[in-house]
């Protein structure tokens, strides 16, 4: 606990994504020893400039106590860079986080195969279904799935893992209790029962634009390989790929080939330039590793049940009708499926939709549910192949 106080103090003074935390672990027996040495010792270390030393001298140690108290209140765990529990794969990069804040239980990432599944927030339905399906199958093979908790590909990969009863790690670019992407709050809560939501930023830290590139180095470091599902030419996913290759030039990069359009420019270019291996099946990823121990006794041939995702492409095959549109007589009585094991709110939303497009505001009016509660339900229903977004924020039965 003492080391935790000093490492939190260090991050409040120096910041995040710095090489200096790791360098201190080699120079001193403990961070406490460094702190107690005072300004003269900080200068002698040769690591800090005058501005940084001035900042350290002004930041009181008890600033850490408030953050630790918040962690205790919310039952968050913490792991310091010099703790035995700190992942070796994360320590091995140049700029590992001084502190990890954890909701849930961080799996033994060093001894378990892990794959990061990443892609655009504005994913197509093909990208959403593919990320869900690949994460589901990899999880069934015992692979830990790592992603960033964002909308689109990230969210779908986490949901696919949860559907497979697998283990997933969600790495955030803000404090883990910050109300960021409220529509994904339930997903993040569910992850903590089968994995962990983690961040290098203390609780209550607001997301900043530069946090997400910093966050990406953690995703890549924790992963044995990176799977890019759908990425444009300027996608943040490419930052994660570059980070992975800077950390380890032999890191395995995979990509799912997509249509020749701007949404897949980045993914396709990775394949074309031989930066990434093209995959069509989760086994392509498993087979690429010669010396990785996959901890599983699960049936890797198991497919997602029809009740869960009856139109999701199995083993990477695209849907028969990639646009997903079917022809219906709009005067036809909606044929809602039965026995879908939906929650009451999910049923309410599902039965508010028919073959003619229904706007989300109308769904809210019919169900008496706020839009922010409807959005994650809509995502679930889309992933299960029950509905489709056809225009704007309007939805119809499939």
Question: Over which residues does each language-model region extend?
Answer:
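Glycine-biased, small-residue-rich flexible motifs in mid-sequence functional cores and linkers
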Residues: 3, 80-398
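Short, positively charged patches
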Residues: 1-129, 133-140
């Amino acid at each position: 606990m003492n080391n935790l106080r000093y490492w939190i103090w260090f991050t409040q003074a120096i910041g995040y994504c710095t090489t200096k935390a790791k360098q201190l672990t080699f120079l001193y027996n403990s961070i406490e020893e460094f702190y107690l040495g005072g300004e003269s010792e900080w200068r002698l270390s040769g690591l800090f400039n005058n501005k940084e030393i001035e900042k350290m001298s002004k930041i009181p140690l008890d600033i850490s106590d408030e953050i630790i108290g918040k962690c205790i209140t919310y039952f968050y765990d913490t792991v310091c860079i010099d703790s035995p529990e700190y992942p070796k794969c994360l320590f091995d990069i140049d700029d590992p986080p001084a502190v990890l804040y954890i909701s849930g239980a961080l799996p033994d990432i060093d001894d378990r195969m892990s794959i990061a599944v990443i892609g655009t927030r504005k994913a197509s339905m093909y990208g959403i279904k593919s990320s869900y399906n690949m994460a589901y199958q990899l999880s069934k093979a015992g692979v830990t799935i790592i992603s960033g908790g964002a909308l689109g590909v990230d969210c779908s990969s986490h949901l696919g893992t949860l559907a497979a009863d697998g283990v997933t790690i969600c790495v955030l670019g803000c404090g883990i209790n910050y109300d960021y992407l409220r529509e994904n709050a339930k997903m993040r809560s569910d992850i903590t029962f089968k994995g962990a939501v983690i961040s290098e930023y203390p609780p209550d830290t607001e997301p900043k634009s530069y946090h997400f590139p910093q966050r990406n180095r953690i995703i890549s470091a924790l992963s044995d390989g990176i799977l890019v599902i759908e990425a444009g030419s300027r996608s943040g996913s490419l930052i994660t790929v570059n980070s992975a290759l800077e950390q380890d030039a032999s890191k395995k990069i995979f990509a799912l080939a997509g249509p020749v359009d701007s949404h897949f420019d980045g993914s396709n270019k990775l394949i074309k330039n031989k930066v990434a291996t093209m995959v069509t099946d989760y086994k392509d990823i498993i087979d690429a590793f010669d010396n990785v121990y996959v901890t599983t006794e699960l049936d890797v041939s198991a497919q997602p049940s029809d009740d869960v995702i009856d139109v999701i492409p199995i083993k990477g095959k695209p849907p028969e009708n990639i646009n997903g549109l079917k022809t219906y007589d709009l005067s036809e009585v909606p044929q809602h499926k039965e026995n879908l094991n939906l929650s009451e709110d999910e049923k309410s939303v599902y039965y508010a939709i028919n073959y003619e497009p229904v706007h989300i505001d109308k769904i809210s009016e019919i169900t008496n549910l706020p839009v922010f509660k409807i959005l994650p339900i809509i995502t679930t229903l889309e992933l299960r192949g029950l509905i489709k977004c056809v225009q704007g924020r309007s939805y119809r039965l499939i």
